[in-house]
C-alpha cells in the first residue's frame, strides 16, 4: 500500500449517506452491491456535520454524487439537506436512484435546490418489463410507470437525466430496447452501462450469471454502433480485451490503482467518514479503505490480475477460463483477458 496523494486533489465524490445497506432499502435487489463492506457495519444514518466535514477536508471538491443509504428513496430528506450544503459551497450535485416513489420522491429530493446546480439524475433502469423489474429489484413496489414519472419530472424541469442499466445474463438482450425507448420518448442521450458483478455477492448465492466474454464484446460493439448513429454519450466497461487491445492498454494498465484519480468514494459511518479510491476492491478488502481524518489516500499497485477482476465474475464463468482463475478466456482463435471494470469506453458522439 502506498501513500501517494493528499485529499486536496479530490474533485469528484461519490457518497453513500449512511450504512443501512439492504436492511432498510426500499428495494431488495438480488444483485445488490451493498453486501461487502456495509454488512459488517452498524446500521447508521449520516448527519449534516459529516457533510460539512467532507467539504472542509476536500477543499477542491467540484462534484458530489449522492447515492443515498443506499438509495435516495431511503433517506430522501437527508440527501436533499446534504445537497443544499454542497450547493451552498459551490459544489455541483448529482443523484442516483432506482426511481422508487416516482414523482413524490424526486420532488422531495430536489426541493429548494437550484436545478442549474444539478448535473444529472441517474436512473437505474435494467429492463422495460415490469416482471423483470420486480425480479431484479426484489419488490413489486416499483414499476416502469414510477420510474418514468420521475424521469418526466426531471425532463420537464430541464434537469439532465442519464440512464444506467446493469446487465446480467438474465437481461442481456434488453439494452437496445432501453436505449431506443428513452431516446425516442424523452430524447435522453446519455447512457452509462454496468456489467453485473459478484465482488460483494460472494458470500450469498444469487440466481444471476455474469455475461459471457464474447457476448459482452458483442454488446459493447453494438452499444458503440447505436451511440454513433444516435449521437449518444456513453460509458461502458470493456472487461474482456483481446491481445491487440491489451497491447494498446499496457501503458495504462495500472494507472488507476497506482496513481489514483480525482475521485473518492465515501461511506458515512457511526464512527467516522470512510473513504476509498476503489469501491470494487474495498468491498472485498476493507484494508484498502481509510478514514478521512488520516489526511492521506491509499492506493495499491498490482502486477498481473487484481483479485477483484476475478471475483467480479461468477464461479461458473471463472471455471470456463483458461486456468480456472478467471484471468484469460480462450474464445475461438484468440485469448480474451479479464481487465478492471474501470477501463471503460467513454465516448460522446
Named regions from a protein language model:
Residues 15-19, 95-97, 123, 165:
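Short hydrophobic beta-strand elements that form part
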Residues 11-13, 62, 119, 189:
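Structural register of leucine-rich repeats
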Residues 25-32, 257, 261, 275-278, ...:
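Short cysteine clusters
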Residues 1-11, 35-39, 272-349:
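Flexible mid-to-C-terminal extensions adjoining Fe-S/redox cofactors in radical SAM and related proteins
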Residues 41-45, 116, 126, 130-273, ...:
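Radical SAM enzyme [4Fe-4S]-AdoMet core and its adjacent flexible, acidic
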Residues 2-49:
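Canonical Radical SAM [4Fe-4S] cluster-binding loop centered on the CxxxCxxC motif
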Residues 7, 22, 26, 57-58, ...:
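Alpha-helix termination/capping residues and helix-transition junctions
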Residues 34-37, 48-130, 160:
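Conserved SAM/AdoMet-binding glycine-rich loop
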Amino acid at each position: 500500500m502506498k501513500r501517494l496523494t493528499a485529499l486536496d486533489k479530490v474533485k469528484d465524490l461519490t457518497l453513500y449517506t449512511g450504512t443501512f445497506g439492504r436492511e432498510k432499502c426500499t428495494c431488495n435487489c438480488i444483485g445488490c452491491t451493498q453486501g461487502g463492506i456495509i454488512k459488517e457495519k452498524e446500521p447508521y444514518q449520516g448527519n449534516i456535520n459529516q457533510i460539512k466535514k467532507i467539504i472542509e477536508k476536500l477543499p477542491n471538491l467540484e462534484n458530489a454524487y449522492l447515492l443515498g443509504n443506499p438509495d435516495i428513496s431511503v433517506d430522501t430528506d437527508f440527501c436533499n439537506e446534504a445537497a443544499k450544503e454542497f450547493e451552498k459551497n459551490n459544489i455541483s450535485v448529482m443523484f442516483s436512484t432506482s426511481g422508487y416513489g416516482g414523482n413524490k420522491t424526486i420532488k422531495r429530493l430536489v426541493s429548494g435546490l437550484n436545478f442549474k446546480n444539478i448535473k444529472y439524475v441517474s436512473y437505474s433502469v435494467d429492463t422495460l418489463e415490469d416482471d423483470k423489474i420486480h425480479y431484479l429489484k426484489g419488490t413489486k413496489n416499483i414499476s416502469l410507470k414510477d420510474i418514468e414519472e420521475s424521469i418526466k419530472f426531471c425532463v420537464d424541469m430541464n434537469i439532465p437525466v442519464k440512464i444506467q442499466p446493469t446487465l446480467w445474463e438474465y437481461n442481456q438482450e434488453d439494452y437496445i430496447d432501453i436505449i431506443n425507448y428513452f431516446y425516442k420518448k424523452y430524447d435522453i442521450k446519455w447512457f452509462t452501462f454496468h456489467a453485473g458483478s459478484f465482488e460483494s455477492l460472494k458470500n450469498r448465492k444469487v440466481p444471476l450469471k455474469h455475461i459471457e466474454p464474447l457476448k459482452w464484446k458483442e454488446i459493447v460493439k453494438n452499444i458503440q454502433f447505436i451511440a454513433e448513429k444516435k449521437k449518444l454519450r456513453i460509458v461502458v466497461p470493456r472487461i474482456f480485451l483481446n491481445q491487440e487491445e491489451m497491447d494498446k492498454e499496457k501503458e495504462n494498465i495500472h494507472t488507476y490503482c497506482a496513481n489514483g484519480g480525482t475521485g473518492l468514494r465515501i461511506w458515512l459511518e457511526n464512527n467516522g467518514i470512510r473513504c476509498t479510491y476503489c469501491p470494487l476492491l474495498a468491498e472485498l478488502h476493507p484494508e484498502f479503505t481509510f478514514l478521512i481524518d488520516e489526511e492521506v489516500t491509499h492506493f495499491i499497485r498490482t502486477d498481473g490480475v487484481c483479485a477483484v477482476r476475478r471475483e467480479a465474475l461468477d464461479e461458473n464463468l471463472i471455471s470456463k477460463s483458461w486456468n480456472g482463475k478467471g484471468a484469460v478466456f480462450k474464445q475461438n482463435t484468440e485469448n480474451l483477458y479479464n481487465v478492471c471494470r474501470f477501463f471503460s469506453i467513454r465516448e460522446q458522439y
